[in-house]
Amino acid sequence: STVYEEQFTTPEWFKGGIMYQIFQDRFKKSDKYKAKKAANEEIRYRHDEWDELPQSSITHENYKAQDFYLGNLKGIEEELEHFKALNVNCIYLNPIMESPDNHRYSTADYFNVDPYLGTNEDFKKLCAKFRNNGIEIILDGVFSHTGDDSIYFNKQGHYDSVGAYNSTESPYYPWFSFMEFPDTYHSWWGFTNLPTVNKLEPSYMKFINDPKTGVLPFWQHLGIGGWRLDVADEFPDEFLDAL
């Protein structure tokens, strides 16, 4: 059985609807947007042709999810009529925030769309256009870990920030757990490019939840209909209650 608070409700638009999930990099590349240079451009592999093999399939080196085929937000917007024909009323986007990996579960910047996908303004327009056509946008909330190549950890030094990896005096240092600083730390299922966060660290909870400056309200003000919470089973109840 499911236990929930009596006042808990779900959005009316979500009930009985059809959800369509999109992995942006491989959905559609529109010529109306040209991918901008990323902070970690040097480690990304841009593909000019949509049907090219991933670089790791050519080199046979250890796979890294850094092949980019440059699917973008404009490509999604151009398929509005396709979604309407399918009676879709909700689109769930895999992570869109800046990340060095094509899956974008290794967040580098929680407040900006990845420059290969588009801009924050592009995303705001997408949300508004789709909502006006009866389709809500849900974002993937990746809050159990960040990327090591990020503003917050900055292991590769691609950002101007003092990340947790760079100094114990970093404002982000309390977010992470180091066994031996700086190279041995807790990471999501042992993937060292995904350092896990201390989910009940007050500064981190404020970063995510603060009504004025937090990650959640930032994207909600851009027009999303809701969130899908990644690995929700790995969060303490106190964090979930605060969302």
What do the PLM-derived regions correspond to, one by one?
Residues 11, 15-16, 32-35:
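Short, charged, solvent-exposed linker or helix-capping segments at domain edges/interfaces
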Residues 24-89, 96-222, 243:
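Substrate-binding/active-site clefts of carbohydrate-active enzymes
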Residues 225-228, 234:
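Conserved, well-ordered alpha-helix/loop/beta-strand core segments that scaffold catalytic motifs
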Residues 1-12:
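Extended acidic/polar, glycine-enriched regions
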Residues 16-23:
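Mature N-terminal segment immediately following signal peptide/propeptide cleavage
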Residues 92, 138, 228-230:
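Conserved beta-strand positions in the central sheet of alpha/beta enzyme cores
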Residues 116-119, 232-240:
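Acidic-and-aromatic substrate-binding clefts and catalytic sites of carbohydrate-active enzymes
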